C-alpha cells in the first residue's frame, strides 16, 4: 500500500475561514463522536486552487446508519452508492462512508455488496473500508485529497498536490478499467478539464477515443444530469470543443455532431454563439434553462426536417410540430428530457416562424407569449449566425423598448387595400 504524504497546516493554503460553517459543524460532530471526518473531493481541490467550492463533501469511517443516528436531520439515499444527506434548511451536506478497494473474491456478485455488468460497469458498490482503501476508489487524483478536521492537515496518497500545482487531470488506477467501471468518468474528465483549465494526462485521455461507445449503456436520466453539468458550468464552449476532440458528442447529441462533421458553418456559428451566451449568463449569475440548451443542440435537425415536410405539402406550423416530435422522440432515447423542459423546447422552435408577423393579432400575441423572451433570444442568435437574414432581431428588440401605447401603434394592422366594386370597369 502506498504511504500517504501528510501536508501539515502551515504548508498548505486551506483555512477553515473558507469552509462552509455547516460543513464544519458536520465534521466536528463526527470527530467528537469518535469517527474519522475528512473533507474530500472537489471542495479540497477548489480551495487549493483559490476557488469558492460549490459543494462540501465529507468522507468518514462511520457507516450510513451511524450517520443517520448522529444526525436526526439526515436521510439515506442511493442504491449504487449508499450515502447520507444531512439537511440544514435548504443546504445539504453529503456524507459518504470510506469504501473498500476490493472485495473477498470468494463471494459472488449476488452475495456481495458490489456488482458489475458484463462491460465492467459498476452497478452496486457498498463495500466499506478505511481511508487508505477509499482513496483508490476516487476517480481523479485531484479529487482524492482529504482535509483532516482533527489536525487540519491534508492527506495525499496519489501525488495529487503535484497534479493540482501542474494543472494535470490524471485518473487513479488503470484508465481502461476505470472508464469501463463507469463510462461517465469520460464526461467528468472533459468537464473538469474545461472547468479547471486542466490538461488531461496522456495515459488518461487515450482510452477515451476507444471507449466512447460505452456511454450508450448509461441510463438517459443520468446523462441528462451529466450534460447539464458539462454545459451549465460557465465553460460550455470549451466543453463542446473537448467533446468534439474526443469524438464523444455523437453519443450525446448525434444530430449536432452530424451537422458539425458535415461542415455546416452556419450551424457551427449558431451553436457557438448559443453556448457563449449561456456561459455569459452563468458567469453573471443569471438564470439559464436546460430547454435553451436542448433547443440549440437539436435546432439544425428539426429545422431541416421541418423544411422537408413543408416541401412535401405540410403547412409550416404543422411541419414544425411534426419535426419537433420526431427529433425529441429520438433524442430521449439517449438523454431523457423532463416534460417541463421539452415543452419549452417546442415553444422556442414553434415560435420562430412567427417573428415574420409584425402587425395585427399574431404579432401582439407573440409579444405577450410567456416564452417570447426565450424564443426572441434564440432568434437573435440565429440572426447573428447568419441564418436569419432580415432585420427581425433589430425590429423585435426595438419594440420591447417602447411603452405599451407606442407598441400598440407599431403593431396596428396594416390598412387593408380597398376592395374593388363588383362590375367595376378596368381602365
Model regions and ranges:
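Catalytic cores of the polymerase beta-like nucleotidyltransferase superfamily
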Residues: 1-427
Amino acid at each position: 500500500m502506498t504511504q500517504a504524504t501528510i501536508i501539515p497546516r502551515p504548508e498548505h493554503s486551506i483555512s477553515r475561514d473558507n469552509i462552509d460553517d455547516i460543513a464544519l459543524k458536520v465534521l466536528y460532530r463526527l470527530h467528537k463522536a469518535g469517527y474519522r471526518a475528512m473533507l474530500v473531493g472537489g471542495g479540497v481541490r477548489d480551495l487549493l486552487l483559490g476557488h469558492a467550492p460549490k459543494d462540501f463533501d465529507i468522507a468518514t469511517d462511520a457507516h450510513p446508519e451511524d450517520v443517520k443516528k448522529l444526525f436526526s436531520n439526515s436521510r439515506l439515499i442511493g442504491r449504487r452508492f449508499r450515502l447520507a444527506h444531512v439537511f440544514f434548511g435548504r443546504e445539504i451536506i453529503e456524507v459518504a462512508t470510506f469504501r473498500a478497494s476490493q472485495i473477498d473474491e470468494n463471494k459472488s456478485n449476488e452475495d456481495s455488496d458490489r456488482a458489475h455488468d458484463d462491460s465492467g460497469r459498476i452497478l452496486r458498490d457498498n463495500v466499506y473500508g478505511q481511508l487508505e482503501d477509499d482513496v483508490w476508489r476516487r476517480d481523479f487524483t485531484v479529487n482524492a485529497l482529504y482535509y483532516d478536521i482533527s489536525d487540519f492537515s491534508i492527506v495525499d496518497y496519489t501525488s495529487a498536490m503535484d497534479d493540482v500545482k501542474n494543472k494535470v487531470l490524471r485518473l487513479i488506477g488503470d484508465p481502461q478499467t476505470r472508464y469501463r467501471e463507469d463510462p461517465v468518468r469520460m464526461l467528468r474528465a472533459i468537464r473538469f478539464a474545461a472547468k479547471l483549465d486542466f490538461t488531461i494526462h496522456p495515459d488518461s485521455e487515450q482510452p477515451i477515443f476507444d471507449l466512447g461507445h460505452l456511454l450508450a449503456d448509461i441510463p438517459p436520466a443520468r446523462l441528462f444530469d451529466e450534460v447539464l453539468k458539462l454545459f451549465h458550468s460557465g465553460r460550455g464552449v470549451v466543453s463542446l470543443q473537448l467533446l468534439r476532440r474526443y469524438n464523444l458528442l455523437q453519443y450525446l447529441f448525434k444530430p449536432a455532431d452530424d451537422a458539425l462533421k458535415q461542415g455546416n458553418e452556419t450551424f457551427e456559428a449558431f451553436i457557438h454563439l448559443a453556448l457563449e451566451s449561456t456561459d455569459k449568463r452563468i458567469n453573471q449569475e443569471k438564470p439559464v434553462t436546460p430547454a435553451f440548451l436542448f433547443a440549440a443542440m437539436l435546432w439544425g435537425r428539426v429545422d431541416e426536417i421541418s423544411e422537408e415536410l413543408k416541401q412535401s405539402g405540410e403547412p409550416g406550423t404543422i411541419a414544425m410540430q411534426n419535426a419537433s416530435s420526431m427529433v425529441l422522440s429520438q433524442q430521449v432515447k439517449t438523454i431523457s428530457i423532463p416534460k417541463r423542459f421539452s415543452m419549452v423546447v417546442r415553444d422556442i422552435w414553434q415560435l420562430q416562424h412567427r417573428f415574420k408577423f409584425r402587425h395585427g393579432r399574431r404579432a401582439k400575441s407573440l409579444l405577450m407569449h410567456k416564452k417570447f423572451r426565450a424564443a426572441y433570444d434564440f432568434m437573435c442568435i440565429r440572426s447573428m449566425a447568419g441564418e436569419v437574414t432580415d432585420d427581425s432581431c433589430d425590429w423585435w428588440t426595438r419594440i420591447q423598448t417602447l411603452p405599451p401605447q407606442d407598441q400598440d401603434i407599431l403593431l396596428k394592422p396594416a390598412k387593408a387595400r380597398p376592395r374593388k366594386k363588383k362590375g367595376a370597369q378596368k381602365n
